[in-house]
């Protein structure tokens, strides 16, 4: 005789294809505190009702498939299925909807961003019933976020390690990004750190190429930062990029960095992958290394308004996977970022509790409980004239990173670093005195330039530089 469960499944099974909305569209569902909630921007194919499209997203990203299967009877679909519980039209857009989906926590492996994304942003994005699909936001419940280590150290521990408080940190990406020998690269690192920067950075493209192997770069950069530390009395760092072709090689590079005694390493978390990133974050926590994260490849995923995934989701994923810094756009400069939206995900990186605020693109209230915060890094086409705006927009808990804005100084790398440090100190002092950086910013920089020839030269070089393109990332 067949087992009872098999008999029941066989008797109750009806083969064929049925509408997703019959099972996965549940507007009466009340979300649980333990559910992972998702807001999808859905563009259905012509003739597909929004309820069917939303239900299809819920089904294909959880327990559903294209036809009824008899093994459905061997489990409890009501316990494990995703549910589309609300749909709202997008204002000003034709045939576009925000579909809200709730996922039971048991669908996801603990501590695995990889597994979470494999379900939520997996095959469903190629589903034929949809013209386009974009994941706008996720609500990560404390019951799930507590299964992650998160950032190796966080903002307060980093400040304590560096002994630097009350101002943004200053950085610089070494340019040209490719082609320098290790010794010349180390020279540029020394000059920038000696001039007053807190950090210098490997470009995301720099791994271990024929013109500069990773071990040589690590050695010369370590020598440069220790020399600059001795001469300035300040703790310095260089983001040594440990990204590699295998996880084993990545960890080997991080181990070598720790043996050199440097304070920080770097990883390209999207091209390297979440599994590799989480492994590196755990190593950094265990061995006292800070972890700088670059977001190379993010625009492939997040730039299109109606398809892909918004960067705020990638930012939340990074906070769970682990990183002490992550690039976040600038609002000003050459790389894209609309102010309210950028500040929305900056808060999601730094703060413990973030209220729902649709004006800033935040679809759900997010409670990170005790997970450490991540410093946002403003980088890309910025220079001394941007310093007041950057200081006002990002506040103290940030890294302001000037690549060309340091190395492009007419007098050289060290004067470029001096110009940026003087501009930052002037802006912080003016802010602390109660001056309005947004309104008086240019005047504050001009006043400081009277006492700093390096800053005056920088102001003259970059006074006409503007990047006047409209941001695409708007609500």
UniProtKB/Swiss-Prot annotation:
GO terms for cellular component: chloroplast. Residues 1-2 form a propeptide. Its cofactor is Mg(2+). One of its GO terms (biological process) is reductive pentose-phosphate cycle. The active site is at residues 175, 294. The keyword Metal-binding applies. Its EC number is 4.1.1.39. Its main location: plastid. The modification N6,N6,N6-trimethyllysine is found at residue 14. RuBisCO catalyzes two reactions: the carboxylation of D-ribulose 1,5-bisphosphate, the primary event in carbon dioxide fixation, as well as the oxidative fragmentation of the pentose substrate in the photorespiration process. Both reactions occur simultaneously and in competition at the same active site. Belongs to the RuBisCO large chain family. Type I subfamily. HAMAP family: RuBisCO_L_type1 (MF_01338). This is Ribulose bisphosphate carboxylase large chain. It comes from Piper cenocladum.
């Amino acid at each position: 005789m067949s087992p009872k469960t098999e008999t029941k499944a066989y008797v109750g099974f009806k083969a064929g294809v049925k509408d997703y909305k019959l099972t996965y569209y549940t507007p009466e569902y009340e979300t649980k505190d333990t559910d992972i909630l998702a807001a999808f921007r859905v563009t259905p194919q012509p003739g597909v009702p929004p309820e069917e499209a939303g239900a299809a997203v819920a089904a294909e990203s959880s327990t559903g498939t294209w036809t009824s299967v008899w093994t459905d009877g061997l489990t409890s679909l009501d316990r494990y299925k995703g549910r589309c519980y609300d749909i709202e039209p997008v204002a000003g857009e034709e045939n576009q909807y925000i579909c809200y989906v709730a996922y039971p926590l048991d669908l996801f492996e603990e501590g695995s961003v990889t597994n979470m994304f494999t379900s939520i942003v997996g095959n469903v994005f190629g589903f034929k019933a949809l013209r386009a699909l974009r994941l706008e936001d996720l609500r990560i419940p404390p019951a799930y976020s507590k299964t992650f280590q998160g950032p190796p150290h966080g903002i307060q521990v980093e400040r304590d390690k560096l002994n630097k408080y009350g101002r943004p940190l200053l950085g610089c990406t070494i340019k040209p990004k490719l082609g320098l020998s290790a010794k010349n690269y180390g020279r540029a690192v020394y000059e920038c750190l000696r001039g007053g920067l807190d950090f210098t950075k490997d470009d995301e493209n720099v791994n271990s190429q024929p013109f500069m192997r990773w071990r040589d770069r690590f050695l010369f950069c370590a020598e440069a930062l220790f020399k600059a530390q001795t001469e300035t009395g300040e703790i310095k760092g260089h983001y040594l990029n440990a990204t590699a072709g295998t996880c084993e090689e990545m960890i080997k590079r991080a181990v070598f960095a720790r043996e050199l005694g440097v304070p920080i390493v770097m990883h390209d978390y999207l091209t390297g992958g979440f599994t590799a990133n989480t492994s590196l974050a755990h190593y950094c926590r265990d061995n006292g290394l800070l972890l700088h994260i670059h977001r190379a490849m993010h625009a492939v995923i997040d730039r299109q308004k109606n398809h892909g995934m918004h960067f705020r989701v990638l930012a939340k994923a990074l906070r769970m996977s682990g990183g002490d810094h992550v690039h976040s756009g600038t609002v000003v400069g050459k790389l894209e970022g609309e102010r309210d939206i950028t500040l929305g995900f900056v808060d999601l990186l730094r703060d413990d509790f973030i209220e729902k605020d649709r004006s800033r693109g935040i679809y759900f209230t997010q409670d990170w409980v005790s997970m450490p915060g991540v410093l946002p890094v403003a980088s890309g086409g910025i220079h001394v004239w941007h310093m007041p705006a950057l200081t006002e927009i990002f506040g103290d808990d940030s890294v302001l990173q000037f690549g060309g804005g340091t190395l492009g100084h007419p007098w050289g790398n060290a004067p470029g670093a001096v110009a940026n440090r003087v501009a930052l100190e002037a802006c912080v002092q003016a802010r602390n005195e109660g001056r309005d950086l947004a309104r008086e910013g240019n005047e504050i920089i001009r006043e400081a330039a009277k006492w700093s020839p390096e800053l005056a030269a920088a102001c003259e070089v970059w006074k006409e530089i503007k990047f006047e393109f409209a941001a695409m990332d708007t609500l």
